[in-house]
Amino acid sequence: MLMPKKDRIAIYELLFKEGVMVAKKDVHMPKHPELADKNVPNLHVMKAMQSLKSRGYVKEQFAWRHFYWYLTNEGIQYLRDFLHLPPEIVPATLRRSRPETGRPRPKGLEGERPPRLPRGETDRDTYRRSAVPSGADKKAEAGAGAATEFQFRGGFGRGRGQAPQ
């Protein structure tokens, strides 16, 4: 597809910087969200990535109406040559992430846990005993209960049925 060279370069620069590219499958979208400041249509992004995919420079995934493209090693080399970048510059997906340093902890609690609140076993036992009175038979009380006369009514949406007598 014919597209301005500035659009192709903007797409390739973003792809090389991030290492991945995401685009919604919408050819009528006026601007790609990540390239909105450069006024690049979403169709140009999709077609440029399709071209790179056919040459084996990106891997494509598609899920939930979105394309996901990942740079391959050959694609990194191609974009480095195309954009005239030195070998020291690498995509964000290949950079090592530094482990985040946590908040500094207070000196007094190193290796220690604060003690739990002391609760006696008596609290637990009284709770368990209060639920079921002693001497009650659980199996005898299971079932429909003390009601011996059942009344059946018409179901939901099945008409009114007969009036009770």
Curated annotation (Swiss-Prot):
Similarity section: Belongs to the eukaryotic ribosomal protein eS10 family.
Residue segments, region Disordered: 92-165
Xref: PANTHER family: 40S RIBOSOMAL PROTEIN S10, RIBOSOMAL PROTEIN S10
GO cellular component entries: cytosolic small ribosomal subunit; nucleolus
UniProt organism field: Xenopus laevis (African clawed frog)
Principal cellular location given in the protein's record: cytoplasm
Name of the molecule in the record: Small ribosomal subunit protein eS10
Keyword field: Cytoplasm, Nucleus, Ribonucleoprotein, Ribosomal protein
Localization of this protein: Cytoplasm; Nucleus, Nucleolus
Pfam families in UniProt: S10_plectin
